[in-house]
Regions:
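Beta-propeller blade-edge and WD-like acidic-aromatic loop motif
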Residues: 1-15, 33-34, 38-59, 74-75, ...
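Blade-terminus and WD-like Trp-Asp/Gly-His loop motifs, strongest in beta-propeller folds
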Residues: 26-34, 67-75, 108-116, 155-163
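Intrinsic disorder/low-complexity signature
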Residues: 37, 63, 69, 100-103, ...
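Residue-level signal for well-ordered alpha-helical segments
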Residues: 5, 24, 37, 46, ...
């Protein structure tokens, strides 16, 4: 798939990427000038950006997916899944990546705010995922609550930080069935 934009009132769609590679998970830069996205143009998923007005896409980081710019625009946060799912960041202008969080439940369950990061943490054996908050000011992580089921794909926090949205897997297993005489 490619990345497209369209005005919220409708109108003409604008194709922003044209690569035969898989491209997904677009997000805006805070100033609205760039669109960050995941692409496997090089054979593995990495972070790329393209001007919001159109133009050539350029690589930001060789590996990772599900990127989001910090509210101040200084960093791009993203998920690396190997050897384990973790949240990383890189300066927006380029540079060395830095590990932010090791214990992220999956690549779609974090939400950046000016004062920190809300995220679904990895659950201990026999438990479900805790929703946690990493404070940028103190560097400390606190548990907000623990889900009663397995965390799904997606987590966000309202602008006033009073309501949290998340998905959960109500059935995380499989059923085994035998069907006789199915012909």
């Amino acid at each position: 798939p490619d990345i497209y934009s369209i005005g919220v009132q409708g109108g003409t769609m604008h194709r922003l990427t044209t690569s035969p590679a898989g491209e997904a998970l677009p997000s805006w830069s805070p100033d609205g000038k760039w669109i960050y996205f995941s692409s496997n143009r090089t054979g593995k998923y990495g972070i790329w950006k393209v001007p919001a007005s159109g133009g050539e896409a350029v690589p930001v980081h060789a590996e990772g997916s599900n990127s989001a710019a910090s509210p101040d625009g200084r960093f791009i946060y993203f998920i690396k899944v190997l050897p384990e799912t973790a949240l990383w960041r890189i300066p927006s202008q380029g540079g060395k990546d830095e590990l932010v969080l090791k214990n992220v439940a999956n690549g779609w369950s974090f939400s950046l705010r000016r004062n920190g990061i809300y995220f679904a943490g990895k659950a201990d054996a026999g438990e479900f995922a805790p929703i946690r908050f990493l404070s940028f000011e103190t560097g400390k992580i606190r548990t907000i609550f623990t889900l009663e089921r397995t965390v799904g794909y997606g987590l966000d926090v309202s602008p006033d930080e009073k309501v949290l949205l998340y998905t959960q897997l109500d059935q995380a297993g499989s059923d085994l069935m035998v069907i006789d005489d199915f012909r």
